[in-house]
Amino acid sequence: MPHFVGMVSRLRDRILTGPGGVERPLTREEMLAWAAEVDLDAVDLSCHCEFSDDAYARNGVLKNDHFELVVICWKAGQVSPIHDHGESNCLYLVTGGTMTEEIYRRGDQPERAALVESREWGRGDVTIADGPTIHRVCNHSSEDLVTIHLYSPPLPDPPNTYSAEEAAGS
């Protein structure tokens, strides 16, 4: 646990408010640099890992005007809604399990989206979804999934959600 507390402290203090820190949302490069410092073998997320039988569980760690850090716990079969992040970038760090990210494009009707691609991310993988990216995060495996999400600026509440539309020719 000390490593995770230190990781959060570095994000808050050094990157955002410490000497030479920034008082603005993080850039993609700053988010990736922070994630590169994470040693998954030393991270103990147990105090931030609560699962739910009903839906994936968002466990807030730290939030201010410039970023939001969340540990999300997914049981087998749990999925997020199809959504975008508004003006936020979202860095995902998979700490355990396999995350499936389904990428969508805007549909022919407002609030509709069509699946165009599916990607799998495993332990230690890092990816960023920028604001306009429409996607869904899924745990299609039979194992639990734990992901760290760094949103900058914080995720809008509520996020923009979409309904799936049938792919052409189906």
Question: What kind of region is each of these model predictions?
Answer:
Residues 137-141:
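Asparagine-centered strand-capping/turn motif at beta-strand->loop junctions
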Residues 70-85, 130-132:
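Conserved short histidine dyad/triad with adjacent acidic residue
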Residues 76, 87-107:
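Glycine- and acidic-residue-biased ligand/ion/polar-headgroup-sensing regions
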